[in-house]
């Protein structure tokens, strides 16, 4: 699989992320034929295989997904819930994080969950106290039942900021059609054959998504925002994409493009150095190009960096 990815030009400059390494949903049926010890061994082998094989290509991983509900998940029997009940959540989390870290010591490792309540925060606290090295906290925000609003988003940010770890909003969706009924507890239970995007819904989606992105971008610990469906209908048939089913762009596509590539973009600027050859710039974090006559030099503005020496 590595050979299929590493030479693709489309991947240049794009950070790839693996999702997920351990999850109780969509597990192999044959795990049920194994003992708990064998299930755990198979899970750790799987982690070593994937993380080692894609090292240098995929260096960000959701190590374990939705562990808050994992030991009490009862929709159907599965091997991962079995070993989570046996070991307990924190012990299982520690084992899968250690296996991932061993396979790729330089990878960024996340815990990820849809549960944004205090239960998730308590689990994270327990993991950190047990010595689990979590690099970033993954927060899902599937808003099929309506936009959270700024107040709820800020409450979630406040709850998980207490750990002073980077926050990754890993799974973001806002629909551009009818809102899913509020009484649905598990989003996966809402299965419809037709869930169209509407003109009114598309305008609402664009406005709410811009507000959501701006709220997250303004927080100093938010490091990543991942939109879950680029094209409508890709998960639960929901109209949650930036593109319609025919791949035509919706208003949200143009609004986020404007936000990221215009409002949150620095330059171009023409600058003149002082007598010492220095110049001061203020800009958004990221990669820049310095053009001086016939030379082009790339450099980065990273969090905490104040000086960059460039030789031309």
Range-by-range predicted roles:
Residues 19-20, 66, 142-144, 219:
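Histidine-centered active-site/metal-ligand motif
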Residues 23-24, 142, 175, 231:
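Positions that flank functional sites
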Residues 53, 62, 67-90, 95, ...:
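Aromatic-rich peripheral "rim/lid" segments of glycoside hydrolase catalytic domains that contact
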Residues 58, 65, 99-114, 120, ...:
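Aromatic- and acid-rich polysaccharide-binding/catalytic face
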